[in-house]
Amino acid sequence: MTIQYTFSMIKPDAIKRNKIGQINTYLENAGLKIVAQKMKYLTKYEAECFYDEHRARPFFNSLVEYITSGAVVLQVLKGTDAITLNRKIMGATNPDEAEAGTIRKDFGESIEANSIHGSDSQNSAKREIEFFFNKSEIIE
């Protein structure tokens, strides 16, 4: 059991439906601590760079268009095995396949508009946190 940091992004569909507080409650009730959080509109360039690993995938352009369609909430989460724990509380990518009680099952609307993104590995968490946050923005 290792203390880890992970990255989370509450997506535009959840922001538009005023679900930030409810999603934060799910994260905190699961044992994750929010140590950094900010709201912003991603530029097309930021979105393309952030999702660069998906550039060759057929959904890349619609993903960039969606993620820039409204504000997002960027977060750094801390906790014991935070990456795995966050993935568990988020649920399956497709809300129709997610377990009851997960963020995506309870708030997601579609595979793309599934309310939340979370890092899938330690390398991804490091890259994603550093993409959006300076060390001085992470408050223990």
UniProtKB/Swiss-Prot annotation:
Catalytic activity annotation: a 2'-deoxyribonucleoside 5'-diphosphate + ATP = a 2'-deoxyribonucleoside 5'-triphosphate + ADP; a ribonucleoside 5'-diphosphate + ATP = a ribonucleoside 5'-triphosphate + ADP
Coarse class of the protein's main subcellular location: cytoplasm
Annotated ATP binding sites: K11, F59, R87, T93, R104, N114
Residues of the active site: H117 (pros-phosphohistidine intermediate)
Pfam families from the UniProt entry: NDK
Superkingdom in the source lineage: Bacteria
GO biological process, one term: UTP biosynthetic process
Enzyme class: transferase
Subcellular location as annotated: Cytoplasm
GO cellular component: a single term: cytoplasm
Cofactor: Mg(2+)
Catalytic activity, EC: 2.7.4.6
PROSITE patterns per UniProt: NDPK_LIKE
UniProt KW Amino-acid biosynthesis keyword: no
Keywords: ATP-binding, Cytoplasm, Kinase, Magnesium, Metal-binding, Nucleotide metabolism, Nucleotide-binding, Phosphoprotein, Transferase
GO molecular function per UniProt: ATP binding; metal ion binding; nucleoside diphosphate kinase activity
Protein role: Major role in the synthesis of nucleoside triphosphates other than ATP. The ATP gamma phosphate is transferred to the NDP beta phosphate via a ping-pong mechanism, using a phosphorylated active-site intermediate.
Subunit structure: Homotetramer.
Assigned protein family: Belongs to the NDK family.
HAMAP family tied to this protein: NDP_kinase
Name by which UniProt lists this protein: Nucleoside diphosphate kinase
Organism name: Rickettsia canadensis (strain McKiel)
